[in-house]
Amino acid sequence: MTLTKGRPARVWGGGGAHRFYSVVVFVLLASLDNVAIGLVPPLYGAIADSFAVPQRLLGLVTAVSFLVSAVAAVGWAYFGDRTNRKPLLMIGTLIWAAGTGGSGLATNYPTFLAAQLLAAVGLGAVGSVGFSVVTDLISPRRRGLVMSFWGLSQGIGTLAGTLVGGLLGAVDWRRPFLVLTVAGLVATAAYLFTYDIRRGQSEPELAGALAGGAEYDYRISRADLPTILGRRTNRWLILQGLTAQAAFGSLVWLPVLFAERARDQGYSAATAIVVGSVFATLFQLGGVLSIVGGLIGDALQRRTPSGRAIVAAVGILAAVPFYLVLFFVPMRIDVPDGAGTGAVVRAVLGSVVSEPTVGLSLLTALLALALTSANSPNWFALIADANPPEHRGTVYSLGNLVNGVGRAAGNGLVG
């Protein structure tokens, strides 16, 4: 690490309101990216029918997109750790917006696949470069808590994608893609006015020097890669995602699982899509408890260096029995077939109370997701704790690459 002395850096804004605005924009960007990820699975059936292809080919699109996004993230992160991160984030957002818009305009399967892969390239930027930026806003003491919000924003985005895809796309599957494209362009414009966050500014060891006008000018190089992989903590943080995400990757099929259950009970395709999306959204609400996992991780980390790892491991292992119950317990669906979207949604929500099998399934899912969500904020925080500022984006992207392979494998196996 090196510090260069000089005049205090001139950065536009940087007051409390400006920093808060910047954090909000980052969170929204992370959410929108995951809306894009969650948009396709609820619409597998409708898109497959439109292009006259089997649903498994739409599952292949999702699996390959995971891989492309993960590979692209490594390149984005490496350049983000070397250069100004703000332009990279804006370019990445524009790329995924263009790919999402192209998906909505596609007239055949190959065009849809190409557009989704273009979007995946852009999505890789926001996750990896955005992570590097956010860690420079957070002091080590509160990393678990703030990273829980970062992870929560992504989870909410995925839920929103599932819900938006099912509700807006039940009649016309192209509509949600076009709506999301506009949202991506608006987010890019909002990002123009965010605070330029200085690399390393959240580190207590650098605070005094940076306040005195020094610049943290160390940048990653290829010579650093052996050092990064030589850290045992990094190796475990990267590799654990292969098996974990093989399981998590299959969760993108939840809307399809519940939609097919509805079809098996005689409901029409349009009603089944809405039912699948609403049930999948409800059943993943337990992810909001990642905040609790982050708080517990922060508290335990102050007592022992393995605190965050213990919280994450216990959460994942404890969730396994609940997932088994969720997937195999039968569920009776009672909604008005052919009714409007609002009526179907109200019926689904009412069935949580009126239908015991639905209530049991929801409780099981909430517990499973609540326990699993302890992993995300503590994984993020451990990467930041174990690495200097110029390495964090790259380490995150390497972990994300392995996660992407696991997600693609899980998605492909289920599909």
Q: Where do the PLM segments sit?
A:
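Residue-level signature of mid-helix packing/kink "hotspots" within the transmembrane helices
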Residues: G38, F66-V74, G124, T158-L159, ...
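Juxtamembrane intracellular "pre-TM" segments in multi-pass secondary transporters
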Residues: L3-G16, R198-I238, V348-G350
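Cytoplasmic helix-loop-helix junction between adjacent transmembrane helices
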Residues: A115-I156
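Extracytoplasmic gate region of multi-pass secondary transporters
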Residues: V40-P41, R231-G286, S290-I291, S376, ...
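Structural signature of the two symmetry-related core transmembrane helices
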Residues: P87-G101, G307-L324
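Conserved MFS/SLC helix-loop-helix module at the cytosolic interface between two early adjacent transmembrane helices
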Residues: V71-P110
